[in-house]
């Protein structure tokens, strides 16, 4: 009996050890200062940032009295972000327009890059490149930035009185109110990660099973949903900031 229980315990420990070592996909890492850095995310994120900065510099470096098509497009995007920020935050939306705009544009271009840029052509020693938002590290980082932003907004507006919201309308709700602030970044990150990952997986499966023409409608649908996900993330981030400044749920 002792031998049998020892064998069972050994199998369980080995099984749990193997499960704990499982990774989703293959990853390419850099060693920087003793830290293991996920290189795929950094490379694609730098490409997205370069696209955003490069397009902005090309359009606004020589503004025309009669706006060009590029100027009109950027002005439209700016007005759109202002409207979203004002609707969700209120009268004090001005300082938060750059933050909300950066979130929206980075997520939007990242999502679209997964469908429009030929990442698969670039060969890595391990793994392959994909949209930055296809990785949970990116979406969690964006969600944590949002959390820091709405805590900062509430504290800068109300000081330490901001924390009184956790015992409103009754102190009994203190654990639930605290839990709510932890679930906000989780819901933001997993919603974005899940949608982008699922979209890319569906396209990959369809391309491998059927001719290229058939998955095209699904790819267009993916572009549409990618834009919607960027809008949802930016809108919720602005809503959380507005909520922390106003103090209502």
Curated annotation (Swiss-Prot):
CDD domains: ATP-synt_Fo_a_6 (cd00310)
Keywords annotated in UniProt: ATP synthesis, CF(0), Chloroplast, Hydrogen ion transport, Ion transport, Membrane, Plastid, Thylakoid, Transmembrane, Transmembrane helix, Transport
Single GO MF annotation: proton-transporting ATP synthase activity, rotational mechanism
Subcellular location as annotated: Plastid, Chloroplast thylakoid membrane
Protein name listed in UniProt: ATP synthase subunit a, chloroplastic
GO CC terms: chloroplast thylakoid membrane; plasma membrane; proton-transporting ATP synthase complex
Transmembrane segments: 40-60, 97-117, 136-156, 201-221, 222-242
Topology in the lipid bilayer: Multi-pass membrane protein
Membership in a protein family: Belongs to the ATPase A chain family.
InterPro entries: ATP_syn_F0_a_bact/chloroplast, ATP_synth_F0_asu, ATP_synth_F0_asu_AS, F0_ATP_A_sf
Function description: Key component of the proton channel; it plays a direct role in the translocation of protons across the membrane.
Summary of subunit composition and partner proteins: F-type ATPases have 2 components, CF(1) - the catalytic core - and CF(0) - the membrane proton channel. CF(1) has five subunits: alpha(3), beta(3), gamma(1), delta(1), epsilon(1). CF(0) has four main subunits: a, b, b' and c.
Signal peptide as annotated in the record: none
Protein encoded by which gene: atpI
Domain of life: Eukaryota
Pfam families xrefs: ATP-synt_A
Major place of residence: plastid
């Amino acid at each position: 009996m002792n031998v049998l229980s020892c064998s069972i315990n050994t199998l369980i420990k080995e099984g749990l050890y193997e499960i704990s070592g499982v990774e989703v996909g293959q990853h390419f890492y850099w060693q920087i200062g003793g830290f293991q850095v996920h290189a795929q995310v950094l490379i694609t994120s730098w490409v997205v940032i370069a696209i955003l900065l490069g397009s902005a510099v090309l359009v606004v470096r020589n503004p025309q009295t009669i706006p060009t098509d590029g100027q009109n497009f950027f002005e439209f995007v700016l007005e759109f972000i202002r409207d979203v920020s004002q609707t969700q935050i209120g009268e004090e939306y001005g300082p938060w327009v750059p933050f909300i705009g950066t979130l929206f544009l980075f997520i939007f271009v990242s999502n679209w890059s997964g469908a429009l840029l030929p990442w698969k052509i670039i060969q890595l020693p391990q793994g392959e490149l994909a949209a930055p938002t296809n990785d949970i590290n990116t979406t969690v980082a964006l969600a944590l930035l949002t959390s820091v932003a709405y805590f900062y907004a509430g504290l800068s507006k109300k000081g330490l009185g901001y924390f009184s919201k956790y015992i409103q309308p009754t102190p009994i709700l203190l654990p639930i109110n605290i839990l709510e602030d932890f679930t906000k970044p989780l819901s933001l990150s997993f919603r974005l990660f899940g949608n982008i990952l699922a979209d890319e997986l569906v396209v990959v499966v369809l391309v491998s099973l059927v001719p290229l023409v058939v998955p095209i409608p699904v790819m267009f649908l993916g572009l549409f949903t990618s834009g919607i996900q960027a809008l949802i993330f930016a809108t919720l981030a602005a809503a959380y900031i507005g909520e922390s400044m106003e103090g209502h749920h």
